[in-house]
Amino acid sequence: MRFLVVIACLISGFTWSQIVNIENKRIYDDTSGWSGSLDAGFSAQQNGQLFYNLNFRPRVQYKTRKNHFFVLGDVAYTGSNAQTYTNSGMMHFRYARRIKNGPWKWEFYTQIQYNELLNQRLRTLGGTGLRWKFVDTNNIRFFAGSSFFFEYEELQSDGVINEAVRWSNYLSWFITKKGLSFTGITYFQPQIDRLDDFRFSGQYTLGIGLTKRVDVRLEYNMFYDSNPPTNIRKMVFSTSAGVRLKLGE
């Protein structure tokens, strides 16, 4: 069981450590001012060994008609006296300025993160680019974005330092109809001076209302790195399916 926990942490952690899906973390709220949440937790369990878990996940925005400030974080530690299963953290800050009250925004962002189990001592990046909302109806929204960012990464075991400028592109959508919802985000991030070195990822969720009381939810996540670190697969993916039964009126 512990082996499965470690493998799950490594797979999800590697994907998360390379491309953070900001789209599904955004707060889609037209209200001006402050909104969001600050989540923190701690748990401990004694079962032969003492296992404990810590996490801190802020997601806060401040929004006006022209300006949008957004802070996202995810800090987690899971371990025992003998072994560490998760020791990772990420903080992301983003500022967006609407252009002439239109569908375009100019964004600036920066990020810092670490992941002990993935040999990542430090990764930082900073970038800027455009975001375009090109479909906006009651039931359908489509967004596209393109930006350039510089990333710096230090590996902890061998002291390797990686630096690169990447071109980040994404397409996201939110579709809701009666009894159906479909959301997705696709990222493509080639390295500017080596276009054959690229990352591609996607997260897609489909919700289907079978009856008034029964819903089905399907999710697929994938990540592909054409030039991954040593001993890491080029492609990882995960799928999940669930059923929800509504009771009462």
Regions found by a protein language model. Give the residues of each.
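Cleavable N-terminal export/targeting peptides
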Residues: 1-32, 248-249
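Short glycine/proline- and aromatic-enriched beta-strand/turn motifs that initiate or cap beta-hairpins
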Residues: 18-61
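Residues that define the transmembrane beta-barrel architecture of outer-membrane proteins
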Residues: 32-34, 50-54, 85-89, 122-126, ...
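Repeated loop/turn-to-beta-strand initiation elements of outer-membrane beta-barrel proteins
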Residues: 34, 66-71, 102-106, 138-142, ...
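Membrane-embedded beta-strands of outer-membrane beta-barrel proteins
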Residues: 38-40, 56-58, 91-93, 128, ...
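Transmembrane beta-barrel strands of outer-membrane/channel proteins
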Residues: 40-42, 71-77, 91, 108-112, ...
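Residue-level signature of outer-membrane beta-barrel architecture
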Residues: 42-44, 60-64, 97, 132-134, ...
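Outer-membrane beta-barrel "beta-signal"
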Residues: 235-249
